[in-house]
Amino acid sequence: MDISHKKKITAMNRKDGMFEIQAKAIILAMGCRERSRGALNIPGYRPAGIYSAGTAQRLVNMEGYMPGREVVILGSGDIGLIMARRMTLEGAKVKVVAELMPYSGGLKRNIVQCLNDFDIPLKLSHTVIDIEGKERVTGVTIAEVGSDGRPIAGTEEYYSCDTLLLSCGLIPENELSRSAGVTLNPVTSGPVVNDSLETSISGVFACGNVLH
C-alpha cells in the first residue's frame, strides 16, 4: 500500500490485515498500465463507450461481450491494430484508426493484415480533439496535428460512433515509487536506475515494465 523513503513497507492481506515490514532491500516490480483518457487530456463529455484496447480485448476474448458496433480507434499500437481486425470480424464497423505520430506504432504485418485487408483507414499525424455524447459516445472529432503535436485548424473531421478505443501506449505504475521518494525519469515516468537497476535510494531496485 505504501513505501517510505526509509524502506518501511505498509502492506495488507486477508489473514493479517494491515501490517508493516522494515526491509533491507526492496525490488519495485509493479508493472505498467494502459494510458487512460485522463492521461491523454482529451476534451469533451465523459460518456460510456470509451475503452482501452486491452480492456476491449478482454471483453471480447474472455467475456464474450461486444463493446460497441461503430468504432473509432486512437493509436496504432499492435493491440489497437489487432482489435481493429477483431472488432471487424465480430461484426463491428471500424470507421478509422487515428495515430498522433507520423508513423504507426505497430508492426508492418499488423498494418497489412489488420487494416489494409479490411479497408480500414489509418490517419497518421491525427488525434481525437473532441468526444460527443452524454450517456453514450455518439461521435468523435479528429484533426491533423503539426510537428508540435497541436491540432491544425481547418482539418477537423467528425465520425459518428458508439465506441472509442484507446491504444496509446503504456505508463509505469509509479505511485509506490513516488511515495518512496525515488527519482523518476521525466521521459519514461519510471524510476531512474544505475547499471545494477538500483534507484536513487540505496537498497531500492526496479525492474521490468515499471522502468519503461
Would you name each region that the model predicts?
Residues M1-H212:
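Residues forming the flavin
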